[in-house]
Structure formats: structure tokens, C-alpha cells
């Protein structure tokens, strides 16, 4: 069984799933940041005076990353490739999006986009700003041509855990119904790897899924993973997003875009150089939608919290207790649409340690 990256098919054409002063300064340093409505929804700029994620490593277990992208090149720590490495997953590359054959697949722009959302460089004169602009990125390529096996993904999670990751982002998921198979012991490699990461004190953030299903997909369904649903620019539950139901109820929501309201209604981030789409792209940048785009927003806020010296349990509690439920205005109250609410970076970093 294969697990897929999770950006919306409608947008991508493939089955993959501050204060005013601060904002103005950010736009001057990052020209596309004026399109990043997600940062405002997260209240990330208001959190940066407290934490920018310095010293934290976010592992992006995904399709690999463009290692030379100007938003990411200066921020990378050594990564690894587990996709298409032979019969048994073992590192056979450095996490580059082009894979072992050196050929970048169209669907494999996904990992660079996810990495940029989480931790793109800020105030560098180009593009965007990441949620945790001073965090580092560990590129782990476990998906090739948009999909990978439970074994490859599990190996990537374990490798990232053993090589210093503080946060692991999983913007990927299996088809609805796979939850039952994992409960019966199939596909246990990813489930067991998530448990291993949590035992080692790593925060694991995963996409809820894009099937409008009632449950979090595997692997966000698994105990130890924080399931992330998507919101649109109006802070409403995105039409494609799964609900946040799972046994341990560890779930939140974050900006993922609508897939219906044009390029600027979705999430702008980096893509491998020169691969921006004709519809929305600007060469090295593009706008995509999906719970894949929501998860790294939360991974970035987790890095902001980790840089404050919090452990994994404290990070998860700060994320959930400070999250806000749209319309109701409540904080830290579980609903199926939003989990414990839309993540609020400024409120999270202000939570007691």
C-alpha cells in the first residue's frame, strides 16, 4: 500500500493529497509575504518577538527538497533519501527532491513547498517568510513521484529522530479506511516509527487528509501524531479537509487554503527553482492548497515553542490549549471541524512553561 502527499487534486492536477509595523517590515524583506494570509491567521509575526525557532530542526519527511533554493539553502542540515533505494529502505541520497535518478517529478515539488511554509528564510529580499524563520530544515525524501510505502516513511521518521530532529512533519496520508488496517497490524512500520519518535521527545505533526472524511487519515490517526485540518483565508474549515476525529483527540487546524478562490486564496511557498506553475507560479514559488499546507504551519509553531525550551508534551499542550475556535471564540475546546482550534502562535508562546 502506498501513502500519498496531500495537496488538493483540484489545484495540482494530481492525486496528492504582527503589528502593522512588523508586517510592513516583513513585506519589504519578503516580497510575497503580502500574499501570506496564513501568517496573519496564525498570528506568527506577533510571536516572533518571543521566538523565531532558533536552534530547532524540523524534519520534512516528504518528496525531498530543492537543496539550492534561496529560501532554504542556508537553513539545511544533512538529510537522507529512502524512496526508491532498493528492496529495503536504507539511505541512498541526501534528501534532494530529484531522487536517486536525478530527475525531478512534477509531483515532487511538494516537499519544497512544505519546507518553505515551515521555515523559509525571512527578510532575505526574496519570496516568503516561514512560520519559524530561524529553524533549520532536515530534508528526508520518503516519497517518489508523490507516494511512498509505510516502510520507507517509517524508516525516514526513525532516521530523522536519530539525527536530531525536534519536530517531524508528515504532509502525507493513506486512503480513508486504512486506519482499520493499521489497527490490525498492517502498515505498522509508520505507526511504530511515530511511537518511537514520541518516546524520544520529538513532536510529530501530520495532515488530516483531503477527502472530506470524518476521521484523520493514517498516519495522523496514529497515537502520538498531532492531526491538522485545514482552514481557508476566512478562517473556515476548508471544503476538502477531513474532520479531526481520532482516538486520542490530538488535533488542531491551520491555514491550508480553499482550492476554490484563486491563487491568493491558497498557500504561497517555495517550489523547486523554475517549476512554478503557469497558473499561479512565479518561477521559484507557487500557491497550493491542502492539509499538506496546514501541517507545516503547525510544525513551524511547534519549533517556536521548542526554542523556548519546552518538551514535546508541553509543546502539544500549548498548541491545543491556546488554539481558538472560529465564530465561537473559545480556546482549547474540541470540535470535529477544528480539533482544539486554529493554532495561534502568539497565544501559544505566551502559555506557561
Per-range role (PLM):
Residues 36, 43, 164-171, 175, ...:
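C-terminal subdomain of the subtilisin-like protease fold in secreted/lumenal serine endopeptidases
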Residues 63-67, 82-84, 122-124, 143-147, ...:
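Solvent-exposed loop/turn segments at secondary-structure junctions
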Residues 62, 125-145, 168-172, 311-323:
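Short helix-loop-beta-strand segments that form the rim/entrance of peptidase-like active sites
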Residues 221-310, 346-350:
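Extracellular S/T/G-rich loop segment that most often corresponds to the catalytic His/Ser-adjacent loop
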Residues 77, 138, 203-205, 226-227, ...:
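Structural detector of well-ordered beta-strand residues that form the stable sheet scaffold
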Residues 1-25:
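Secretory targeting and sorting signals
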Residues 140-224, 236, 278-296, 329-337:
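Substrate-binding/access-modulating region of protease and related hydrolase catalytic domains
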